[in-house]
Regions:
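Transmembrane alpha-helical segments
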Residues: 1-10
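C-terminal luminal/periplasmic domains and tails of membrane-associated envelope-modifying transferases
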Residues: 12, 16-41, 45-266
Length: 266
């Protein structure tokens, strides 16, 4: 283990900094998951006596469910350290399970290690609000569901979007989910391809329905007030948004997902 702790050649993947960053934000109800077994000794050296769980090696989908479902039921937030995915989880079953069953808030890279953060919250399986919003000619948003209506600064806003491919989708698109203040200024956002990049739009088949979950991290200094949540789509590698039509009428380049109330922290 000497090399892991003291040889600069091993410092590219800075587990000390990862552990420090997690410790700075950890709160009761958080846990850390390691997706590669050889992460255990070096990470727990810097992060001892905490809730840390090694993921099963080469899991199948049932094994991923057996491992993750109890953790998602016990903890509110999960930190995932992804390293050597091609060897430890080549089919990405851990990441796929979490895309279906949690709300990812973002990634951060430390050398070759990727730290991802997920919020565990109720999982709507059908829209709470139905929509008939068409993005371009090939994609329809059938509706959305929010978990909760009032949030405090620092909370995660869980959003589920329900997409449908009307026909073959020729290109890859990203989704942006944005929280706007009363002046229309951006307050928080999450941008990624559907399913956290696992369900690329150019793989959708006509009639396919995609349940797509997003965790929007609210800034710690977000002022209290009412905010509007919106969703849009844009081409990967570009910035121009797809046009939106609702009830056969042009509706700009985004769709409103309703309002969210931010209240002072207790």
């Amino acid at each position: 283990l000497h090399n892991l702790y003291f040889d600069p050649a091993y410092a590219r993947d800075d587990y000390r900094q990862i552990a420090s960053d997690i410790a700075a934000s950890v709160r009761p109800g958080d846990a850390v998951i390691l997706n590669a077994p050889n992460q255990w000794e070096v990470f727990t050296y810097y992060y001892p006596d905490q809730d840390v769980y090694p993921a099963p090696y080469h899991p199948d989908l049932a094994g991923a469910d057996d491992f993750l479902a109890p953790l998602a039921g016990r903890y509110r937030r999960l930190f995932l350290l992804y390293w050597g995915d091609a060897e430890s989880d080549p089919q990405r079953f851990i990441e796929t399970w979490l895309a279906h069953n949690a709300y990812k808030t973002g990634d951060r890279w430390y050398g070759r290690v990727r730290l991802a953060t997920y919020e565990a919250a109720p999982l709507p399986e059908e829209p709470a609000v139905a929509l008939d919003a068409h993005f371009g000619d090939a994609i329809r948003l059938n509706g959305y569901a929010l978990v909760g209506g009032r949030f405090a600064p620092g909370d995660v806003l869980p959003v589920t979007l329900f997409w449908e491919a009307r026909t073959t989708v020729a290109e890859r698109y990203k989704v942006t989910v944005q929280l706007l203040d009363g002046a229309g200024q951006l307050a928080a956002q999450r941008d990624t391809e559907p399913g956290d990049g696992l369900w690329l739009t150019d793989t959708w088949w006509p009639g396919q329905v995609v349940t797509d979950r997003y965790g929007i991290s609210l800034p710690d200094d977000l002022p209290p007030g009412r905010y509007t949540l919106v969703a849009a789509m844009y081409r990967v590698g570009g910035c121009e948004r797809l046009p939106v039509t609702c009830a056969d009428e042009p509706a700009g380049d985004y769709v409103s997902l309703g309002q969210v109330e931010v209240v002072p922290s207790q």
